[in-house]
C-alpha cells in the first residue's frame, strides 16, 4: 500500500471520518464514526483517549493496528500515513495560534495560499471569512492587537477558509472569559452547521450547542454513544452523569427496585427497555439534584461511610425510622461531604452508606437554617417518580 493515498475529494456516501484502530502505547482502542454533516462530541475524564482520537484524525499520530478513514479513504494505518498538511482537516484549539507577524487577513489567507490559491483570490476568500465571523474591520490588525474573543473569531475564519472536510474542536472556548464564550459558542454553532465536526469538551453547554451526537470514552474505550439527548437522558457512567447534571447511583436489581451495596433500596420509574432488567443484574438510577430534599437526621445511628453493621434497607415502602412520613418516596441516610453556594442556591453533596455520592440543590436559606456543614448526618428524600432506573449496559 502506498505511503501517500489519494487526497482528492471524497465520495459523499461514506462517513466523514472513522476511527477503527489501536494505539498500544496509550492503551487506546477506539471505534468511532462521524457521519457526513454531523457534529460529534467526544467526552470523558482526563487520560481517557480524547486527545489521541484528535491526533489520529489530524494526522499527528499513526495507529499500531486498524485504520483511520476520511470519507472512505484510508489515511492512517500501520502501513499508510497521509501527513497532516495533506489532509483536509483543520483544528481549532483553546489558543488561537495565529502567526504573530501576520495581520488577521494574512493569517486567514495563509491556508488557501499554502494550498496553491493565488494571493488575490486567497485574500478575497480571507476577507469574506472575516466578514462572516464579524471581524471584517479587524483585517489589518496583528494578533497582539486582538482581544481573546476576536482572536478566536479570526482563528475560526482561518480554519474555514480552506473549506475543510473535517473540523476538530479541542475545547475551543476553555480559555475565553465567561462574558465572551457565549457569543463565540453561538458563532461556532452557526458557522459549523452542516459540516463534519469532532468536538472535545468538558462543558455540557458545548454539547447542547455544538454537537449532534456524543461518544463517552474511558480508559481508551468507547463506553456509550448516541445522540446528545439520548446520552444525557440516560448516562451510563459517572462522567456522563456529571455532564447531564444528575447523580448516578449503582446497584443490583431486586424485583422492581435497585439494591445498593450499602443496603439502600432505590425505587423509581423503570426504563421502557426491559432488556437487561432481571433480578441480580446490575442497574443504575439517575437522580436530578433539584428533586432531592434534605432533612437533618435527628438520631443518626452511625456514619454512612463506615456502618458498624450491615444496614437495613430503606425504600419508599420501608422508610428509614427518621424519614418524614409522606407519600411513597426514597429516603437514604447520608453524610454531607461538601456545600457549594451559588447565590440563592446551594449544591449539597452527600455520601450514601456505600460511598456513592448524591447531589441536592436547595436554597441557600434552607442550607443555613438546617445548619448544614461537612460531616452532618442527613436524610435525602426524593419521590420515586423523579428517579429513573436503567439496566446497566
Regions found by a protein language model. Name each.
Residues 58:
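Helix-to-loop junction immediately C-terminal to a conserved catalytic motif
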Residues 75-90, 114, 231, 235:
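ABC ATPase NBD coupling module
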Residues 120-138:
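Conserved ABC ATPase "signature" region
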Residues 142-146, 150:
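Conserved ABC ATPase signature
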Residues 161-165:
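A short, proline-enriched helix->beta-strand linker immediately N-terminal to the Walker B motif
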Residues 189, 201-264, 298:
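Internal alpha/beta loop-helix hairpins
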